Amino acid sequence: TNENEEMNVGIQFIDGIYIQTKMLLYYSQIHLNQQEYDDNREFAKTITINLLDFNYFASKECEKTIRIKTNQGDIQLEEIEMKAIELPKFRCYDRENMTEREQWLQYLKGCDEKTLKKIKQQNEFIRALDEKAEDYWIKEKME
């Protein structure tokens, strides 16, 4: 963040059943995992990123920020923040000049080999993640 604020971030892929319940349960799990530190530190703000490989919301935008409000609308619980990203709605119109955000979304959505190679050349974090995933699948054994 701009203020060097400590944050607790969780990322999950969600299938098409019980979407809202899964988002809330995952948020609470990630947030409460901070208790395991048991060193009296303050809870960091938790943000969960929920990746959907299908369309769920009616709007055209691929990314939603979800916060919980009271039924009166006068209090917003700013600490509770969940992101939902509908990957099928993501469109990258200029694959030659992708922003870092577009690179991540294109990587998570899936892309052709040429685009993937370009993304990995430009983004060291995606390259490292892709190498770890490749190593994992090489070592994974089916039983």
Residue spans of the language-model regions?
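Elongated, amphipathic alpha-helical interaction scaffolds
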Residues: 1-143
